[in-house]
Amino acid sequence: MAGGGRGAGLPAAGEAAKAGRVGVGTTKRARDPSPNSKDPNGVVANLLWRRYSGKVVAEVKASILPYVASTLEAKQVEKGKEEGLTGKTSRERERRKGGFVGVIAAEKKPALQLHGDEKYQKKAGNDPVPPTIDDTSKTGGLHLHGGHVSQSPPDSNALSSQRFGSSSPGGDMKNKTRKRTCTFYAQGRCKNGKSCTFLHEGEVSGSDNQVYGNHGGTGEGSEIQHPSSSKEHQFKNSAGSSQHEIYRTLVHAYGEDNRGLTHPVVKHSCHMLKASHGFKIGGSLTANPTNEVVQLPVVQEKNHEPYFMGHQISLGTNNCLNDMGAYSRLRLDGGKLQFEVAKGDSPRDSHLSRSYLEKNPLKPDYRYQPFDSTISLDPHQYSKKLSAYGGATENLPHKHQEEKSSSHVSYSLNSYTGFRKQGHDSSDFFLVNQSLRATSHHGTLPLHQLTPDKDASHHKGADFDKGGTSRSTLHVSSSSQPVVASAGKLSPIKDEVWITSVPFVPSFNFPDFPGSTSPSKSQYDPLVDSIDPPKVESLNNLKTSNISCSISSQHVDTNVIRGGSLEKPLTFADKLARNVSAKGSNDFGLISYDRGHSSSLDGDNRVKTCERKNDASLNNEKSDFRFHLVEHVKELVKPIWKEGNLSKEAHKLIVKKSVDKIFASLEPNQMPETEKAITTYITASAPKIEKLVKAYVDRYRTS
């Protein structure tokens, strides 16, 4: 029965296997045989399942494997063909684009490195890449053309396509048709002459005046302009890398010791660098094209000087960049740096605008502190609001770039700023206060460019005007000592003297009491008032000097003392209040039970006496006296404690209340100090203390 049941499922499984459906097998009953009544252990079912499953797997493999193998082989062949066609097409495209047959620059050397430790290249697509040419004899960076090698300055799209294998999708299409520059003509070795297909530097091309820049839309808004025509050669060093050296010179124009605007590494012969006065403002060109405009990234050199980020720098006309010649002038215009050069100007005439990031010399780590400043070249018309990290909101006219007269600069700073230039043996330092206006004249160093010169031996002056009322002069020398500028004369700091309305009177200058033997205006003696005069009519057995008691008038009618005896017997509290002084002792005195009802003058004297004697010695005396009292009270309670009529809490409470009661009956000046006095007091007051303890025992005992 079981075998027939499983055999019934075989044809269905066979049909599924013949149909070639992968993953379709036998039924659940066939795959998972379970024992039944005839086959309790499932041995027969397992044997049948193993035999059947082996046949099915063999049939499936035989039908599927050939198809899978053929499919994989076809895909590999197709993929290989596509890769071959793609590689061939890309190589042909590169050859057609470069216009030469030979070693491909993108395959030999994908990136043109300008310097070993400097990288001016950014990612392709968004940020513009500065035009750089390396004219050294490197095989990967040269282009073979007509028997001689030429090299052209790559634009942003071409440079990104050479380095990354693809051109920028947003690039300018006109730049692709622009002619390339012949490198051999610049070196004087071009043999083709006018028939050369490459553009010579002296020739004029119609497509050279166009501007190519940042098409990726960066936030800085900086552009890179194409070099225009010029009849003279560009500035070159011994290696021939003209644009590279110009770029490095402009990068180091601001920051290298701030003495001149020349790069300290460039020490070669100087050639005249031609540049027109045109500049680019807000995406439009002026009448004259600009010869060299290079983008400045953020560069950090060894002297840790901040450079401008994303601003435009242009060169003036007939300017020479060397260590001994004329110096240039930097201006901020429309968010761009304008680079002006005049031969007759000296380093002191150079006008260097305030950078966006400056050092804060007040901090030891010399981090760059951004700040907001308002700079106005013309206080009546033109003003520019510079943000903390760059950018401009207004454009200034071109006439402010070439002015050599006095330029008025007003500052409204939000924080204290300062300069400190490193790398000199003489350094100048100054502080600019808030709301400080400065005026710099021609021939003097402006206020915000107090930088030292090696050959400077005279003083430079700058005038301050704070609030338009007071004026002072700042003299800055080139010595090694720092000079700090202060706006106006500072008034000395005066401490406010607090004057009280009531004159101060010492605590010991109290008025003399009536009956006192001390002269007037004498210091108060606490010992005089520590003992009150007796107010009882007669106490023959007590001395006057040892009595310090006062009985109020409202209680005199009940207990009237006559001739040392009482009409009525004293209460228990009154008996306890009487101390050993009642027997003629000179150490203690008798006080009444209602001592709190004394006159105000006596009470004040007692309080003052207690405050003056509340010191460490008094505390020690109290502790000794309390210790002896506690021991005496414990001896009195001990027989009752042994009988078992007192609990532990009741014993502690009786001892505590008894000692507190005795202490409350004594004044601080009546406390026995020595052990002999303490023993005498306890012996004399033993009956009173015993009665007090007995009263507390009767109250708290448990019968």
Swiss-Prot record:
The transmembrane segments are none
Chain intervals with Polar residues compositional bias? 149-169
Where in the chain are the C3H1-type zinc fingers? Answer: 176-203
Q: Record's SUPFAM superfamilies? A: CCCH zinc finger
Which Gene3D superfamilies does the protein's record reference? Zinc finger, CCCH-type
Claim: Cell membrane is one of the keywords in the record: no
Q: Which residue intervals are annotated with compositional bias (Low complexity) in the record?
A: 9-25, 470-481
Q: Where is this region: Disordered?
A: 1-42, 112-176, 204-242, 442-481
**Has keyword Metal-binding?**
yes
Alphabetized GO MF terms:
DNA binding; zinc ion binding
Instruction: Kindly state which keywords UniProt assigns to this record, in alphabetical order.
Output: DNA-binding, Metal-binding, Zinc, Zinc-finger
Record field: compositional bias (Basic and acidic residues) = 112-125, 451-468
InterPro entries on file? Zinc_finger_CCCH, Znf-CCCH_4, Znf_CCCH, Znf_CCCH_sf
Name the record gives this protein:
Zinc finger CCCH domain-containing protein 36
